[in-house]
Amino acid sequence: MVTIQADEISNLIRERIEQYNREVNIVNTGTVLQVGDGIARIYGLDEVMAGELVEFEEGTIGIALNLESKNVGVVLMGDGLMIQEGSSVKATARIAQIPVGEAYLGRVINALANPIDGRGEISASGFRLIESPAPGIISRRSVYEPLQTGLIAIDSMIPIGRGQRELIIGDRQTGKTAVATDTILNQQGQNVICVYVAIGQKASSVAQVVNTLQERGAMEYTIVVAETADSPATLQYLAPYTGAALAEYFMYRERHTLIIYDDLSKQAQAYRQMSLLLRRPPGREAYPGDVFYLHSRLLERAAKSSSKLGEGSMTALPIVETQSGDVSAYIPTNVISITDGQIFLSADLFNAGIRPAINVGISVSRVGSAAQIKAMKQVAGKLKLELAQFAELEAFAQFASDLDKASQNQLARGQRLRELLKQSQSAPLTVAEQIITIFTGINGYLDSLELGQVKKFIVELRTYLKTNKPRFEEIISSTKIFTEEAEALLKEAIRDQMDRFLLQQQV
């Protein structure tokens, strides 16, 4: 039998007392009262923060949105099929955040920044809150650098600058996504990081966009955030903020970013669904009272950083879908008032074969010529006025039987200018090519050609200048000015090409 000395017992007790850890973990917990339709009502969770992440017993994560006196309304970030009434929920003391980093370039992710392209995990270099405060007044500077879209109608008349927010608005099937993807394609070699956020789209549409970007080598500098139509409303609501957080990561590292929200109407509908299920009082068109704040806090994050912060930028192109061209509906008017201009795409123009179907009359950029290089200002200054006068005259000509010679000439030139603005999808033009096109049309060099010959002549003229007069493009890209030398080169090329073209037509 082993005998234990009294001093050994006291030593053992002393050791155990020294090893005792007095740390107490307080966990804020609650109980599920009710669950369904992507919403859970929780009793307890007394000290939960607004927007805090909560974790259910079976692993589902939710966000506490409604803090009421008797219970907490939580929106689920999953289907929540395994959550049972009476099961426990614990607060995580964390606000929604996502991993960020360079490794996200070229990847397709969901609203929680998890990869969904089947290419393995992504190694993040840090974390950012999904909802961050927008830069203040002192942190910004006014927009002054152009962000070229490669679309002649936009770059010449509705210019977009780095750090601007320009709304793309129009009915369904009018080419809104095409304008956005063409802008991404045109950023190749411009050192601009692009983020494309697809909200509530068909999975096939998103796959089509990703394929286009991959084929053209644009995925190297692009991140796609996708929450398709079958995703929970919570994730569709969060997706734009996830995209903004990723773009901000690059903006605060003195880089230029472009973010496309396709589209914010679907996000507003997802938020309306969540709000009605949370029993928040409905307002106009059954949207909750804070739907304006939903979009303003998102779009205000787009900015041009001040010199102190390294002059990074985040340019936002939100897309909004209208019903039968009604721009006075609730969401369109809200987003128009938040953004720095809008590009209006018309179904009538689209059906008439004018693509991109941009209605130049009611489209506007509130930054204006500050977002254009000097060469473009010099050449395109008269273009919008000419087209506006042409549209007016065309409407009048439908009723007038006999027009004077000057009016007939103006109509002919307007038709040729409109022909020049037509562009096929995924075929962005360089600034020099746009200047060639506009200069030729504005100065009447195309008036002698048939309407059907205009496109062919311009394509051949661009090729001729590129091969025989490369100096022209050098001048535009290096000086950004349409100098006398550049003008002389262009006029000479137009004359040479016109002679050659007319000879070809006679043969």
Swiss-Prot record:
Single GO cellular component term: chloroplast thylakoid membrane
GO molecular function, a single term: ATP binding
UniProt-annotated binding residues for ATP: G170, D171, R172, Q173, T174, G175, K176, T177
Organism: Ipomoea purpurea
Descriptive protein name: ATP synthase subunit alpha, chloroplastic
UniProt entry tagged with the keyword Thylakoid: yes
Keywords per UniProt: ATP synthesis, ATP-binding, CF(1), Chloroplast, Hydrogen ion transport, Ion transport, Membrane, Nucleotide-binding, Plastid, Thylakoid, Translocase, Transport
EC number: 7.1.2.2
Membrane topology summary: Peripheral membrane protein
Family: Belongs to the ATPase alpha/beta chains family.
Top-rank lineage group of the source organism: Eukaryota
SUBUNIT field: F-type ATPases have 2 components, CF(1) - the catalytic core - and CF(0) - the membrane proton channel. CF(1) has five subunits: alpha(3), beta(3), gamma(1), delta(1), epsilon(1). CF(0) has four main subunits: a, b, b' and c.
Cited InterPro entries: ATP_synth_asu-like_sf (IPR023366), ATP_synth_asu_C (IPR000793), ATP_synth_asu_C_sf (IPR038376), ATP_synth_F1_a_nt-bd_dom (IPR033732), ATP_synth_F1_asu (IPR005294), ATPase_a/bsu_AS (IPR020003), ATPase_F1/V1/A1_a/bsu_N (IPR004100), ATPase_F1/V1/A1_a/bsu_N_sf (IPR036121)
The keyword Glycoprotein is assigned to this record: no
Reaction(s) this enzyme catalyzes, per UniProt: ATP + H2O + 4 H(+)(in) = ADP + phosphate + 5 H(+)(out)
